[in-house]
Amino acid sequence: MKKWQLVGTTVLGASVLLGACGGNDGGSGDGKDLKGSAKGEGSSTVAPIVEKLNEKWAKDHKDAKISSGQAGTGAGFQKFIAGETDFSDASRPIKDEEKKKLEDKGIKYHEFKIAQDGVTIAVNKDNDFVKELTKSQLKDIYSGKAKTWKDVNSSWPDKKINAVSPNSSHGTYDFFEEEVMDKQDIKAEKNADTNAIVSSVTKNKEGIGYFGYNFYEQNKDKLKEVKIKDDNGKVTEPTKKTIQNGSYALSRPLFIYAKDKSLKDNKVMSEFMKFVLEDEGKAAEDAGYVASPKKTYKSQLDDLKDFLDKHQKSDKKDDKKSEDK
């Protein structure tokens, strides 16, 4: 299993409407002069961060529109591979099979770590016995092996567990499957809407669910967080500090994947991506998540600028060759 360390809201509808798709109408790139659009799709976990970023962006870029849906990480990558989007929001790293499909289509991309998150396990606020769980106990619950709380711990009530999970289109599902389930199938009530998962746990006294830290923070008056106990007996809970330094057992990075072609050919996309990295995680914190270390943003911004500079120099050489002909 892969452990991530030191990598660098409002309730949303079916899509975070920030603008239209994928074109560049020109402009100098300075504030109001920048015109065009860029389109994304992907993680509902990342969506609140993109919404906060766009609130800041739109103040100075009224004619440069950014749109991003929240159909889930997997669904986002499907559209990214199909050529329907300029960028893809993800709450997990891109899979090998997704990389292969992009490679087969000749699509190159940049991966940007824009924030950090901790997948939070929560039970109903009236649950007075579940304070911590091991990954093994979580696996028993979500594989269906443990059907009652007594099956998890003999001192707990003999009451049926109501386990809920995101569906397989979500990166949070993939992350949990890898980090907790050891690739075993998740046998629980599944829902595409994270807010519906939160609601299910709040309404059912025997409920348990998992979701991004932001969703717990927004609903902590109605939920009870469960700490994670590792094999050595160390207990950790999700806090901004433990998520950022990677000591929380279910911490993870959050990503935006941007197509090289869009970065090179669409000024709106390249300027927005620079804006995201220059923000240094402030929007992530505003959305209830955790910023990556500043050096993470700086190194990625430097790499992006180098990439764009090389592209611009290459374009000038091509233009010169055309003139010489």
UniProtKB/Swiss-Prot annotation:
Disulfide bonds: none annotated. Residues 1-20 form the signal peptide. Pfam families: PBP_like_2. CDD domains: PBP2_phosphate_like_2. GO terms for cellular component: plasma membrane. Residues 23-46 are annotated as: Disordered. One of its GO terms (molecular function) is phosphate ion binding. SUPFAM superfamilies: Periplasmic binding protein-like II (SSF53850). A lipid is attached at residue 21 (N-palmitoyl cysteine). One of its GO terms (biological process) is phosphate ion transport. The keyword Repressor does not apply. Keywords: Cell membrane, Lipoprotein, Membrane, Palmitate, Phosphate transport, Signal, Transport. It is found in: Cell membrane. The keyword Lipoprotein applies. It is a lipid-anchor. Gene3D superfamilies: Periplasmic binding protein-like II. A lipid is attached at residue 21 (S-diacylglycerol cysteine). Part of the ABC transporter complex PstSACB involved in phosphate import. Belongs to the PstS family. The complex is composed of two ATP-binding proteins (PstB), two transmembrane proteins (PstC and PstA) and a solute-binding protein (PstS). This is Phosphate-binding protein PstS. It comes from Staphylococcus epidermidis (strain ATCC 12228 / FDA PCI 1200).
